[in-house]
């Protein structure tokens, strides 16, 4: 074994670990946000859209009271280290809910999960 091959193996291992760590953090953040979304009909929770490189536009017809389907869709779209990941909810009332418009989530959805992730990382 050469020094070069040792370095290559190390770089692959570190790269994979870093990629998995970044992806895992993003999954926790996005999942927490989705599950913190207050539920009436499930439309708000079902309208979270994950994407890479650019925020998703428009809304969906998805309704997801449990949140599992929305999380599964988000997980499939999340990239690892070096990726720019977005989670957006384009429903017209999502911003109102984020800033105190719901008794179920008076502190919002995104902000509380962002703060939670910052404490962990």
Locate the predicted segments by residue.
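Short, low-complexity, charged/polar segments at coil/turn and helix-coil boundaries
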Residues: 4-93
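Protruding loop/beta-arch "assembly-hinge" segments enriched in small, turn-prone residues
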Residues: 99-121
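Short, cysteine-centered beta-strand-loop-beta hairpins and adjacent loop/turn segments enriched
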Residues: 94-98
